[in-house]
Amino acid sequence: MLIDRFGRPVTNLRISLTKECNLSCFYCHREGQLDGERFMTPEEIERIVRVASRLGIKKVKLTGGEPTIRKDILEIIRRLKPYVVDLSLTTNGTTMYVLAEKLKEAGLDRVNISLDTLDRKKYKMITGFNVLDEVIKGIKKATKLFYPVKLNMVVMKGVNDDEIWDMMRFAGEVNAILQLIELEVPREMENSQFFKDFFYPLKPLEEKFEKLAVKVKERRMHRRRKYFIPIDGKIVEVEVVRSMHNTVFCMNCTRLRLTADGYLKTCLLRRDDLIDILGPLRNGASDADLIEIFKRAVLLRRPYWTSNSS
């Protein structure tokens, strides 16, 4: 198993399959990626994951951009599944109604679907497109095939902070888990007008959940708390993702990232931590060479939010 200098095991690999997306969400961080021209093939992704699995990485999440716009998405899933115990996908849901059954057959274990609002006008304002109805259909289809389905809601001040309870009800109706996510930016953007305008702190809401929940669990990943809250006769599972200045969140991160153009990346918010793995692979690197590249990347890992930065 890979363990960094801070004693944190690395068990998860988050792979961006593309920087492209069929929506244009105004807050999107693009998985912390910069522009690049390289493009990983299914064979190259498979080899990297095969090597990662030898190092104890058994959970892989496919992201983007929007990963399902890759025409070879089913091939990628089929290639990766033999090497991992948990293969998941984060998607905007626009293709889910059409692809859900094929994704399941290819070997996908579970899905996270982005859904920031249930209001058509707001959805178009946030994403630039009027496709909310298709996404809702896709969510309902996904919940019949996958468990759990998680709905990712980035909570933004003055945009959708008035919809949290409605989203909880919807999650209960479709038997999904709701993830409430704080808007996240790097340190240099904390004083930006964008952050001041849209950041909505989730700590007060989490304190309210503590009182309302019939049960509370804590995940190993980031020590995120999961609240089981009664609403309209159902128990809805709500997970709060609160990363800004959260030292506990960082100290319990078990992720490594692979960018769409083939760089290992140790942290979403860092841009000084890229380690090229695709270049050496294309230049004939052996599996032993690729293992050393993984080890080098893990040595670079350090918590973004610390007691000195919080």
Swiss-Prot record:
Residues involved in S-adenosyl-L-methionine binding: 27, 65, 114, 189
InterPro entries membership: Aldolase_TIM, Elp3/MiaA/NifB-like_rSAM, MoaA_arc, MoaA_NifB_PqqE_Fe-S-bd_CS, MoaA_twitch, MoCo_biosynth_MoaA/MoaC, rSAM
Name of the gene this protein is made from: moaA
EC number of the protein: 4.1.99.22
Signal peptide range: none
Record organism: Pyrococcus horikoshii (strain ATCC 700860 / DSM 12428 / JCM 9974 / NBRC 100139 / OT-3)
Keywords linked to the UniProt accession: 4Fe-4S, GTP-binding, Iron, Iron-sulfur, Lyase, Metal-binding, Molybdenum cofactor biosynthesis, Nucleotide-binding, S-adenosyl-L-methionine
UniProt xrefs under PROSITE patterns: MOAA_NIFB_PQQE, RADICAL_SAM
Primary enzyme class: lyase
GO biological process: Mo-molybdopterin cofactor biosynthetic process
Pfam families: Fer4_12, Mob_synth_C, Radical_SAM
Protein name as annotated: Probable GTP 3',8-cyclase
Annotated residues for binding of GTP: 14, 61, 90, 150, 255-257
Role description: Catalyzes the cyclization of GTP to (8S)-3',8-cyclo-7,8-dihydroguanosine 5'-triphosphate.
Cofactor (UniProt): [4Fe-4S] cluster
Cofactor note: Binds 2 [4Fe-4S] clusters. Binds 1 [4Fe-4S] cluster coordinated with 3 cysteines and an exchangeable S-adenosyl-L-methionine and 1 [4Fe-4S] cluster coordinated with 3 cysteines and the GTP-derived substrate.
Record-listed [4Fe-4S] cluster 2 binding positions: 250, 253, 267
